[in-house]
A protein has these predicted regions:
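Conserved alpha-helical scaffold segments that buttress catalytic/binding sites
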Residues: 2-306
C-alpha cells in the first residue's frame, strides 16, 4: 500500500460497539455452540423460567467483547447459534428426548456447548447428551435435586433421575448446598450414592472457586467429559432476586462468575447450563445482566483454552 494512503478510521463507538450478542451466528466451524432450552413446566416454584433464553439473548447486547481486567478480547471467537429447542409447552418427561438430541448434535461437533434454560430439569437430558458412561457432573446449586421421582420428573429431581438412569454417584459433585433448604432424606441419598458434597460452609472455609477447580481436577482423572450445571439459586438471594430458590447467605455473584470462567477454561468441560433464572421475578435487570455476564465469562474461559 502506498505510504500516502491512509487507513479508514474505525467506526465511532458513539454509533456502535461490538457486543457478545454479535458473536452468535451460523458459522458451522465454530467450536462453541449456544442452545436455548425454554423448559418451564413442572417447576416446584411457579414462575417463567421459559422466558430466560430470550431474555439472555437480549441482554448479551449489553455485554462488550472486551474484558479490561484481563485484557481478554472475544472479538474473534465465533459461537454457533443453534436456536431454541421447542419445549416450552412440554413436561420434563416429554422434553427429555428433544433436549438430549439437540444437545448431542452440538456436543458431538463442538468443543463446548452452552445450554440456556429453563428450569433445572434440563440438566438430565444435557448429561445424557454426553453419555452417562463417560460423563462427570458438577452442580453449583443450593439444592441436592434428589427429590423422589415417583410423582414424575420436575426441576427438583434431575440428579435423582440421573442416578436411577445409571450415572455413578462418584462422578457427581455438588457445591454450594444451603442449610435449611434440603432434607435429611436427600442428604442421606447423596451419602449412600457416593456423591461429593460441599456445603456453603465448606465454600466459605475453602473458597467456592477453589472447590470448583478441585472437583474439575478430580473428575477429569476418570471422566472423559464433564458437564457443569450452573443453577443461579446458589447465588445469595440479595444478589439474585430472579432465582425463585435462592436463599440468604448464598454464594457471592463475583464467585459465581469466576467459576464460570474456570469451567469454560477446562478442556474436559464439554457442556454447561444455566438454570432457574426467572425473568418474571427480575428486579432492575439484575438477573438478566448476571446471566449475560455468566455467558461472557464462560466464553472468556474458553478463549483461554486456545
Amino acid at each position: 500500500m502506498p505510504s500516502h494512503v491512509e487507513k479508514a478510521p474505525e467506526m465511532s463507538e458513539n454509533n456502535a460497539w461490538r457486543s457478545v450478542h454479535g458473536l452468535l451466528g451460523a458459522d458451522t466451524a465454530a467450536r462453541v455452540a449456544f442452545l436455548g432450552v425454554p423448559l418451564g413446566r413442572e417447576s416446584i416454584t411457579r414462575g417463567r423460567c421459559d422466558l430466560a433464553p430470550a431474555t439472555l439473548r437480549a441482554a448479551l447486547k449489553r455485554m462488550s467483547v472486551y474484558d479490561l481486567e484481563t485484557g481478554t478480547d472475544l472479538s474473534n471467537l465465533a459461537v454457533f447459534d443453534a436456536g431454541e429447542v421447542g419445549v416450552a409447552a412440554l413436561t420434563p418427561a416429554e422434553a427429555f428426548a428433544p433436549i438430549r438430541d439437540a444437545a448431542r448434535t452440538q456436543t458431538q461437533t463442538r468443543a463446548l456447548t452452552i445450554l440456556a434454560g429453563g428450569n433445572n430439569a434440563i440438566t438430565r437430558p444435557g448429561v445424557h447428551a454426553l453419555g452417562l458412561r463417560k460423563a462427570g457432573l458438577i452442580t453449583l446449586d443450593a439444592h441436592f435435586d434428589l427429590r423422589d421421582t415417583d410423582g414424575g420428573l420436575n426441576n427438583g429431581n434431575p440428579i435423582q433421575a440421573l442416578l436411577e438412569d445409571g450415572l455413578e454417584g462418584a462422578a457427581v459433585s455438588q457445591i454450594g448446598l444451603a442449610p435449611f433448604a434440603n432434607t435429611r432424606k436427600a442428604h442421606g441419598k447423596a451419602r449412600r450414592a457416593g456423591i461429593t458434597v460441599h456445603t456453603l460452609a465448606d465454600c466459605a472455609t475453602n473458597g467456592f472457586v477453589v472447590l470448583v477447580e478441585s472437583e474439575l481436577e478430580r473428575l477429569s482423572g476418570f471422566c472423559e467429559a464433564i458437564y457443569v450445571d450452573f443453577d443461579i439459586d446458589v447465588i445469595d438471594r440479595a444478589q439474585m432476586p430472579a432465582a425463585p430458590g435462592a436463599r440468604p447467605g448464598g454464594i457471592a455473584v463475583r464467585d459465581f462468575l469466576a467459576a464460570a470462567r474456570v469451567a469454560g477454561a477446562h478442556p474436559k468441560v464439554k457442556c454447561v447450563d444455566l438454570a432457574e433464572f426467572d425473568p418474571g421475578r427480575d428486579v432492575g435487570e439484575i438477573g438478566a445482566l448476571t446471566a449475560a455476564r455468566w455467558f461472557a465469562e464462560v466464553l472468556a474461559g474458553f478463549a483461554a483454552r486456545q
